[in-house]
């Protein structure tokens, strides 16, 4: 049986997983984590709701962030603010025991000035809805040139 350690997950991230009561990898995590930790490749992963997709793509992102570089290195685009908030919260919890990796979530329905202020601080991982990201780019607040990792999160569907 696979373990997070056998997938190449660091002890610090495993501690974060355990803090979320996640002890064994799911199928989507077993298929994606080792591949994505090795190198940023194009990867399409599909799995049911509640199977750990967020951890499947965010763990490799977290482990490949250079925390000494104060720039946005990963972009996660998501369709709704609720999903963006959820993703940012989980990444924050996963990084609890790592070197300081900073995640910011930006989305409509909140004051853009507060989000601009947050982005002036060090941000490594940006979680954004498309509309708010475009608005911030038009204002020249977000520089995506240093981004090495991009994840497009699809909307959950129930069948």
What are these regions (language model features)?
Residues 71-135:
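Conserved nucleic-acid-binding Ia/Ib motif block in the N-terminal RecA-like helicase ATPase lobe
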Residues 17, 29, 45, 61, ...:
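Residue-level signature of catalytic and energy-coupling elements of molecular machines
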Residues 42-57:
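Walker A/P-loop
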Residues 34-38, 55-68, 92-93:
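Walker A/P-loop NTP-binding motif
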Residues 16, 20, 35, 48, ...:
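Amphipathic alpha-helical segments that mediate coupling or scaffolding at interfaces
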Residues 38, 66-70, 96-98, 117-121, ...:
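Conserved catalytic network of the ASCE P-loop NTPase/AAA+ motor domain
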Residues 150-159:
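Conserved small/polar residues in nucleotide/adenosyl-binding loops
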Residues 2-44:
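Conserved pre-motif I regulatory segment
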